[in-house]
């Protein structure tokens, strides 16, 4: 039965949250999956991601670290990027920076890491580096500024987007 399959629960929760469903309800589904299998690295990764989207940055970091510990060699998702993004959303740009650099190195084809890194550099006042990252991002995708409705907090959306606008040289 799907209700007892951690993989189905986690995938459904992530997909529905991405489409804008109630994130608290989706986190309950992920929590259920982790009750069924506490060693499910992908479940911890998705939990960290949803917690970051919900603005629960400390829990996002903790759950993403668990995913990395459970699956240190085979990545089950961009947990390092989630940790960097959570530090960024908590306005700890100095802590976010090394994680986002590592995330970009781990998966140079993932545009998310470039976006978070460019925004982080911009908020640190390092605009030349932010613009260089945007150049690299454009080699991966033409979409520099994405839809950020996954971030449930208007403050977090604006923090991320304002950094990207600075990085591309747009007016704040």
Indicate where each model-derived feature is located.
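Conserved structural position within tetratricopeptide repeats
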Residues: 1, 31-35, 68-69, 104-105, ...
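Helix-start (N-cap) detector for alpha-helical repeat units in TPR-like alpha-solenoids
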Residues: 6-7, 41-42, 75-77, 111-112
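Structural signature of tandem alpha-helical TPR/SEL1-like repeats
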Residues: 19-32, 54-69, 90-102, 126-133
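Terminal, low-structured helical/coil segments at or just beyond the last alpha-helical repeat
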Residues: 143-172
